[in-house]
């Protein structure tokens, strides 16, 4: 288990923002990390852009297109993380797709991610049954391979939870990422099932966009993950987005910490 990830859940309910690297630019992404940390983020998910992000809705898909057409590469993302690590020790995990890792070379990717100071990896398109080829390498280099658990059978939730590292990413609804007006999944029951098997922090993501939802989800879990609503601000304000994102993250963090 990565120490930094574990610690990010020890200070109360965690708020975990997601941004796409290089949207609007890698320089702005770096500034966003510092701003979100100042606003109270406990852990940050960095998306490495990919041409076919199957788990993403239109907002994050558009961000991937913008980042790639701006010339973002995996190596440039690594260089940016290295720069961030000179100024910040906030826990950070990559969220990307198996193809990004494969095309870079799996061991080369994981080794480099660990070297530049990343703490974990989320691969939403790799099912539990196929995580073996990443699992051993991640453990070898001290990177937590974060499991996603979607609304599914009790047996499957227990099976995935048993092998969880870092934290468990509880997917609030089936389908792609994006902002939803209501979340119907019984997150509390899902979290209880995980906890029966393993004492792992559970953070909820997919579909959370406003403070009311964040507060509700934090009440049933250990933390809240928000992506599309933040990426939407990056798309809307471009290079001017940093203060808007900072303000939004602060409002969400405040909601998550309300008792």
Please state what every model-predicted region is.
Residues 15-19, 44-46, 92-96, 121-123, ...:
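Hydrophobic faces of well-ordered beta-strands that scaffold small-molecule active sites
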Residues 77, 192-200, 209-215, 219-259:
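Alpha/beta catalytic cores of nucleotide-metabolism and tRNA/nucleoside-modifying enzymes
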Residues 37, 48, 61-123, 256:
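Active-site beta->alpha loop and helix N-cap motifs at the rims of alpha/beta catalytic domains
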Residues 26-36, 152-162, 204, 208-224:
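Catalytic cores of alpha/beta
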Residues 62, 70, 158-196, 233-235:
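Glycine/Thr-rich beta-alpha phosphate-binding loop at enzyme active sites
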Residues 41-52, 118-122, 127-130, 172-179, ...:
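Glycine-rich phosphate-binding active-site loops on the catalytic face of alpha/beta enzymes
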